[in-house]
Amino acid sequence: MPLWTAPSTSAVDRVRAAHRENVGAESAHVASAPATWALIGEHIDHYGGIAIMGLADIRAAAAVSPRSDGLVKVHLEHTNGDTVKDEISLEQVSALAAQQQPGVDSEGQPIEPPAPEGAIAARLGGIIYTMINRQLLTRETAGADITVVNDIPDSTGLGAAAAIDIATALALLGTADDLHDAPLRARIAEVCSQAVGTFARFPALRARHSAALRGAGDSITIIDYADGSVTQAPHMINKDIAAFALAVPGDVDSAEAVAEIRARERFIDAACRAFGTPSLRLLPDAPQRVLEWLAAVHKVHGTENQPTIAQATAWLTFYSEETERAEGIARALRSRRGTELFPLLTQSQSALATVYGFNSAEKLAQLATARGAVASRSAHAGTSSAVIAYVPSARATNFAADLAEDGLLVIPLSAGSPAITED
């Protein structure tokens, strides 16, 4: 397979033309957002750890125009030529939101709602619904035509869906005066993550939305959920190190992994409710106390829909140790000690497979290392079998050519820029 290259014309120009062709009118507003890649932290995002993200120079663009019939119609064009058309009414979106409200059983225990299964129209319609309810859009909003051109290859762990979320949200906001202000961008990221968690089939990764909106092209974004800070550190891709996303072409069956991720998130949420804490990371002596609480839950309510003590021990161990690794990587980035990064990334990949139980990318990571990468780590273990490989610049060209010749999808990662409106 040849080395992946971006289309020669911008996604913004193509989405304007596609919207004109499919809707029959010019778009009201257009916005674009970058691909995002995780250095570390995508599986401790919900725990309240540290997520470290980069932006890539591949983008998704969205064009919107208003409707008056209560429908959200989506036309999505992928970089591989696939086209998706989907629609939903805002009334249906409201009904889906109601289904996600938790109940309580006869013993006072919360009843978890079914996992959302929404496709692209429900996902983007959910963003509109949430923006209305969070007073980012007027309640007079009565639907939208949304056209999306996505240049980010799917199943590569580069956050195509999150980029579409952000591009759509910014386009819906149009020419608002304060779209570049950090407080509003933080609010937009929060709204997108909330909507995805309520309506979409794949769980939300908050760090992608935050990085796409608040990152910077020439630096790495560090999101620390202990205090909610979003800061920048010197970029690790430089004259000495190149980075690539590597993936096996084709769709990945991630249904089982998605269910596993949701089960772990429910466990974290239940423990946080039990201890009255916003995140387990902020709970003193969390592993011991949470395991004692879980044992009590087993004793009183049984083990149905609950992890075993062994499973919970492994998860909590991973969360704690991965947060420590993320802290070490953040320190190394800030002090420009690049050689300290790669052992920590290798340890993280090993822990994902052996401790956390997500080994979908393990063989590809091993192959990349064998071919000359100084480190390779899953792009998003569970939902993708892709890896991010870090290669000395002197070997980068041969590395990419060899793996492309083996039939892998090889995407060079260059620094991107944050999401913007394109009006």
Predicted regions and their residues:
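A general alpha-helical scaffold signature found inside nucleotide-binding enzyme cores
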Residues: D57, A122, P183, R187, ...
